[in-house]
Amino acid sequence: MTSISQTAAPARAQAAPKAKARNAALDRARTFITMLVLIHHSVIAYTYFGHTDKQKFLGFDCVVVFNDSFFMAAMFFLSGLFVWPSLQRKGINWFLRDRWWRLGLPYIVCVVLLMPFAYWAIELELHNPNTSFAEFWWRTVTVGPWNSGPAWFVWVLLALDVIAAIVYYALPDWVETIGKLSLESFGRPALFFWALLIASIIVYVPAVLYFGANRWFSLGPLAIQASRILLYLLFFFAACGIGAVSFDRGLLAPDGEMARRWPVWLGATIASYACIQLLIYIKHSVLPDINHQPLWWETAYALAFVVYSVAQTFNILALFLRFDNEGSSIFDPLRESAYGIYLIHYVPVLWLQYLMFGMSFGPVDQITAIIKAAIVFVLTLASSWAATAALRKIPGATHVL
């Protein structure tokens, strides 16, 4: 095997990056998870957990748990897959410059303009309907809270990319062990699964028991969920290691055992999600105090969360590698616009929910909640997709979006 450290040094001397062929299965998996993000935000106002609209549908609570228990870790994993090849191809300077334009600039636009405008809808809906946008914006950036919405993922990813560049410069051989494990997992994917699972338990369970699941660290618009910092870091760098070697010879090879054994990952996903739902039922129907859970319950939920997060990440990647790696796909038209859709979508989501607040579209609240969520999702996807397509026509915008 060619040493990663041997390829890293000449990469730093490259003056300009060269184009790299896209991986259809991974592109489609990333687009699929972006659609899950849109669904997540479209339905959360109509959950018993969300406490926003009076119309609620319990099934949406299950959707939120289904998504929130894995999809951000999976997004960091998918993002990390391409970091090491990008560093090797572009060198550190080009890589960081590209990351600034691709992540830093959009993040600033989001937190300065888009997210304040999005959260203004919540201010009008739940607090003061007479607040002007100028007044709300000034209070947001001077007094707070300065919510970054889904854009928090962008700044955290930028920070992880900077850390990766430092590791690439100072410890270029650091990811080679992970890369070797990926190669060994071509025929034995359980090796990587168990390694990632055990490491996830180590970094997540103590953190969530100490910080709790709902605590966020924030500094101005920079925010991250405290208990998941190390989990996201782990998923990101685990993927960096996979990307440091050839996809065709490692864990994510289309003809590898991970893709072939997709029923195993699907079964693990279903079983771990069932455990999560069982623990939620125990919390609401068995335990004496819904607001204070015993240590055994918190530990069991943390373990179920981690198993589901790892299993579902493997499951989605395996399914796309096995069944959606060639030919055309329903996700292909969205591929080029997926990132822009992610950045923009929260604006139409919150404003559509605001405009329909209090409306009734059916004889029972559950039907109204389903109709509202469907309207929000369809119009959000259409409007954010159209906005992204329009923005991408601006000269140079494709380097950002």
What spans do the regions from the language model cover?
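Alpha-helical transmembrane segments and their immediate juxtamembrane cytosolic regions
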Residues: T2-L401
